[in-house]
A protein has these predicted regions:
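Formylglycine-dependent sulfatase
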Residues: 1-207
Length: 207
C-alpha cells in the first residue's frame, strides 16, 4: 500500500492483537506497517495525531514506518503521531504530484547516491535516495536509512521487558520484509491461536 492509503484494516475488524489483548497480553507493533494509516486516503495530516492508527486495532503500543523504506513519508509513527516531530518543518505528502521546487530522482540524478534509480523509485529525494511518492518537510523526524535497524530494534526489548512485568506479550516486529511474532508458546497461547484461526475461517461469524 502507498504511504498515504487509509488504514486497510478497519477498527471494527477483529485482529490477532485484539485476541491476545483480550487474553491479558500486552501488544505492540514495531517496524514496517504497509497497511495504511488514517481514515481517508490522501487525507492524512502528518503534523497532527492520526485519527486511525494501530491503537484502534488492539495494539497497546506501536513504533512503525508509515509504509516501507522506499516510500514516503520517511518518518516513524509512534502511537499515532510522527516520532520526533519537528514543528519548524511541517510534513506534506502526495502520491500524485511533486511539490514546487522539490528535487526528484528523475530530474536530479546528480543528487543521488545511485545515479540510476528504477522507474517508480525516482520521485522525492530523502537522504540521497529517491523514493516512491512525493514529500517535503520532516526535518528532525526524517529517518536515517543507514540507521533504520538501529532505530527500530531498541523498542523490541523495552516492549517485552515492560510487558513481562504485567503479563505475557505479543509483539510484531517488521524490520523490513518479514514478520516475527514473539511470545511464549504455551498451551494457552496455542489455544488462542486456534481460536483466532477459527474466527478467520470462511464459516466464521467473527467475534
Amino acid at each position: 500500500a502507498a504511504g498515504d492509503v487509509k488504514m486497510i484494516i478497519r477498527p471494527e475488524q477483529y485482529t490477532m492483537a485484539d485476541m491476545f489483548k483480550s487474553a491479558g497480553y500486552a501488544t505492540a507493533a514495531i517496524g514496517k506497517w504497509h497497511l495504511g494509516l488514517g481514515d481517508k486516503t490522501g487525507g492524512q495530516d502528518w503534523n497532527a495525531p492520526l485519527p486511525a492508527a494501530l491503537g484502534d486495532l488492539g495494539f497497546d503500543y506501536h513504533y512503525i514506518m508509515a509504509a516501507t523504506a522506499d516510500r514516503v513519508p520517511c518518518v516513524f509513527i509512534e502511537n499515532g503521531k510522527v516520532a520526533n516531530y519537528d514543528p519548524s518543518d511541517p510534513i506534506e505528502v502526495s502520491y500524485t504530484k511533486n511539490f514546487p521546487g522539490e528535487p526528484t530522482g528523475k530530474d536530479n540524478p546528480e543528487l543521488l547516491y545511485n545515479l540510476h534509480p528504477s522507474n517508480g523509485h525516482d520521485m522525492s529525494i530523502v537522504n540521497g535516495i529517491s523514493r516512491i511518492g512525493f514529500m517535503k518537510g520532516g526535518g528532525k523526524a526524517l529517518w536515517k536509512d543507514e540507521n533504520i535497524a538501529d532505530s527500530i530494534t531498541p523498542f523490541m526489548p523495552s516492549t517485552l521487558s515492560n510487558s513481562i512485568k504485567t503479563s505475557l506479550s505479543l509483539c510484531i516486529l517488521q524490520p523490513m520484509m518479514y514478520t516475527f511474532l514473539v511470545f511464549p508458546m504455551t498451551a494457552s497461547v496455542e489455544r488462542i491461536l486456534w481460536d483466532y484461526a477459527e474466527t478467520q475461517s470462511p464459516n466464521s461469524t467473527g467475534r
